[in-house]
Each structure stands twice: as C-alpha cells, then as structure tokens.
Amino acid sequence: MPEGHSVHRLARSLHSSFAGEPVRVSSPQGRFAAGAAELDGTVLEGADAWGKHLFLAFDRDRVVHVHLGLYGTFVREPAPAPEARGAVRLRLESPRWYADLRGPTACDVLGLDGRAAILERLGPDPLRRDADPELAFARIRGSRAPMGGLLMDQSVIAGLGNIYRAELLFRHRVSPFTEGRAMRPAVLAAMWDDIVGLMRDGVRRGRIVTVEPEERDALAALDVDRPASDDPELDGGEDTLALRRLRRSTGTYVYRRDGRPCVRCGSTVRAQDFQGRRLYWCPRCQRAPRVRR
C-alpha cells in the first residue's frame, strides 16, 4: 500500500498538471460512470492529500475522494491519451496531460461535508503544515496498545505504513511491543520531528530512504548478496551513486531485513506477523521496557 509521502507526491503532480482548468473526466471501466458524467468538463480547482487519502476538488464544492488501497495506481502521462486498456476507473484529460486511476479501494464524489467526515476519522498528518502532533501524543499515551499497532492506526497518525512504522521505531530504539502509555513525551516529540523529515525526504526523492548517509556503505556491505528491492516505495525516484549502492538492500535498517545482521549492533533482525502485517525489529536495539500493571 502506498505510504503517505507517495499520496502527497501524487497530489502535487495532479495539482500542477490539472488545477485551474476544465478537464475531461471519464470512466472507461464504467464503475465511476455517474461521477464522471457529473464532473466532465468542469474545473479541477486543486488536489491535496491527508494521510493516504487523495482529494480532487472540483467547482461547486464537489470533491473526488480516492484511496488507492493495496493495489491502486494513479499514473499521469503526457497527452494525448491512448485507448484505455485494463480496468481504468477514472481518467482525467487536459490538452497537456492525462491520468489513469486503476484498482482503488475508493473513488467517490463527495461534498465538503463528506470530506470533513473522512478527516474526522484521521489523525494528524506529518506532511501537513496544520498538523497538531499533540493530538497523536495524547492518543498514544492514553493507550495500552503496543506502539507497533498505534503507528499503523490512521486515527492516531495519518500516512504511516509498514515501512515507516518499522524504521521509525528502530531509529528511536523503541520496541514495537512497548505500550503507548509507557512512551515518554520527549521521545514522542523526537519521533514526530523525525517522521516529518523522513516523509518530506520521501516526497522529494520519490522513495523511502531511512538509513543515515554514514551507515549506507556498511549496510550495503552486509546486504551485498541480496537482490535489489522490488518494492515501489523503496526503489525508483531520485537516482544517485549513494542510492544505487543501496539497490542491493532497501535503504532501510530493519524493514525486509529479517534474518540479517543489524547494522548497528550485529544482532539478527527479526520479523513476525502482527495485526495482519509483517513486523520487523532488532531485539537488542529495541528492547521493550517493563510496564507496571
């Protein structure tokens, strides 16, 4: 599933390509035919994101809400648009660009009230300037749930996925099994500042890199026999010599590195199924504290 930085990057791309002009809207697949007919030829006023949710604002307060889910893609290409192939749920067209949406979990026309109802369910988004991290801190510190689950809860922090969850916890030496109520405010504040920086970097690069520059050569040496990543969130985007060396690994400390040595302590990185997703951590660097009952 695309993480929040990818959806923000997509929103910026669509905004720069289509905002401020009438667009052709169609649904070659047919599942969005009624919505497309309502919007066809109207002005797309802007595109923005909150967490993993994409919003396309059209005139007369109409909003298309898109959630890509696990398999959705929304790809922009230069015009002219070819004949649609495959299950294209939504196509946007302008004289210069077209964009095809395939396989989303959600694609619906909403009003402003509908958008507000979705945002009510979401926590603060680290990539939004109006984000209030204190809302996330209060939810975390008021919970007995483990941090490995809380960071994936979109009502706590919007936009984090499996990669950022694993890497953020490792970078701050927090066990994924630590209860939220055990977290110190200073650690939560440091984690928030860190994830803001990591996600902004992800928007800029077009890929997730969480390994500090001074540790990249050591990690690449540990993973020299490992195939390049096939995860679109980890590969692609900015291509530099330093990042090409990381193609042998993933540019991450623990994510998808189970069974391999931790670059910081040498212990074997572990993984297990946790709440429906794969969880990665270093048992030595991320020891769980005891919590009084």
Features from the language model and the residues they span:
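Gly/Gly-Pro- and Ser/Thr-rich, intrinsically disordered tail segments characteristic of DNA damage-repair
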Residues: 1-112, 185, 270, 289-293
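Low-complexity, intrinsically disordered/propeptide-like segments
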Residues: 13, 17, 122-125, 222-225
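Basic, nucleic-acid-binding surfaces and adjacent catalytic neighborhoods in DNA/RNA-processing proteins
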Residues: 22-35, 53, 139-293
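Phosphate/anion-contacting hairpin/loop surfaces
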Residues: 64-174, 179-186, 191
